[in-house]
Amino acid sequence: MNRKFYLKTIIATLLFSLSTLTAPARGGDFTAGKNTFLLNGQPFVVKAAELHYPRIPRPYWDQRIKMCKALGMNTICLYVFWNIHEQQEGKFDFTGNNDVAAFCRLAQKNGMYVIVRPGPYVCAEWEMGGLPWWLLKKKDIRLREDDPYFLARVKAFEAEVGRQLAPLTIQNGGPIIMVQVENEYGSYGVNKQYVSQIRDIVKASGFDKVTLFQCDWASNFENNGLDDLLWTMNFGTGSNIDAQFKRLKQLRPETPLMCSEFWSGWFDKWGARHEMRPAKAMVEGIDEMLSKNISFSLYMTHGGTSFGHWAGANSPGFAPDVTSYDYDAPINEYGHATPKFWELRKTMQKYNGGKRLPDVPKPAAPIITIPKMTLTEFSPLDLGMSMPTTSHDIKSFEEMNLGWGAMFYATKLPQIEKSSRLSLNEAHD
């Protein structure tokens, strides 16, 4: 063989090999077929683990995703939290721990698909359900309704989400197989026009080819169900699974079934005991669903921590949530496998196509012990107040252009002749 031709052949082969290594993944497809999801035309059961990237320090993302894969999951499900990305109106941040696109790419690197739930409302025991505080500066705003200003701001946010994540849909070679429209809206109101507008905004943001769905409870999913969206149910451990899907199967007898939130535990409120749910009920529920080819997302598989002021509150009344979002999940707050994890892993192994599940990764960081300490100094609460102002009534945070933190109120009460009780009702942010 001519030596020059031989060298050209080797170089061409190497260049071709390098190009195949660096080329983007070819586009695929994920659709709703007859009684099953179809991944590139083949039946597919979604086994999703709910993780929230803002509740996990970025250096630990990879270990948490690997933990989910070792549990037998094939998909990561996540919310996109509007208020952490747009803390000031018009200023978007998708960097550092907010880099949701990097989180999705990391999931793909670990062989996982992704379900994206971009709200605009997400609940999740998160500050204002993910809605930015500055929306309330407009006093007549109607949140989660067809309010022109609200929808305009939703459109701007979802457009930014699209810039980050639309290139990562499965049709573009990425891991995103499904995108959710709104969130459990049936438990909030009845307004198909509003839900339709959110659907249109999501589509216009670049999610026009990916499978779109909406989630609700069995008791209210018909309130706002749109004909062109996939419908999924949310329910917890101990539920009668056939009963949860009964009405849906009557309306859509050939639709693939999915529990988009199967609650592994529950959240904790200030002053209450730590919520716990038995592993047996969770494992039996997942076993039953998988035996019937019902897809699911385990909410939460790992809860993490609501850092800073991001923990939300529940109503009626005022029931603030603690910063720990442990949720009694199979992977605890600091990323370790719990007894629930090991029990569920045994069941998930049965549905892994005869292949051995990946090894469970080591913890991302050791648990440290903080020694006892004595506090010897203090500071007055009103020291260093930066925005003193006088008002005839109590001003809200939004009226003071504040999103988080603490506000110190002081007043002089009139002198009274006899003792009385002073009540401050509903005084909270």
Give the ranges of each region predicted by the language model.
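N-terminal carbohydrate-binding accessory modules
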Residues: 24-75, 105, 109-111
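Bacterial N-terminal signal peptides that target proteins for export
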Residues: 1-11
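Carbohydrate-binding surfaces of carbohydrate-active enzymes
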Residues: 151-180, 186, 191-195, 199, ...
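Bacterial N-terminal signal peptides
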Residues: 10-20
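Conserved residues at the C-terminal ends of beta-strands
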Residues: 50-52, 79, 182, 302
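Aromatic-lined substrate-binding rim segments of carbohydrate-active enzymes
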Residues: 61-127, 199-210
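Aromatic- and acidic-residue-enriched carbohydrate-binding clefts of CAZyme catalytic domains
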Residues: 79-91, 96, 124-149, 316-328
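Substrate-binding/catalytic cleft of secreted carbohydrate-active enzymes
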Residues: 116, 120-153, 159-298
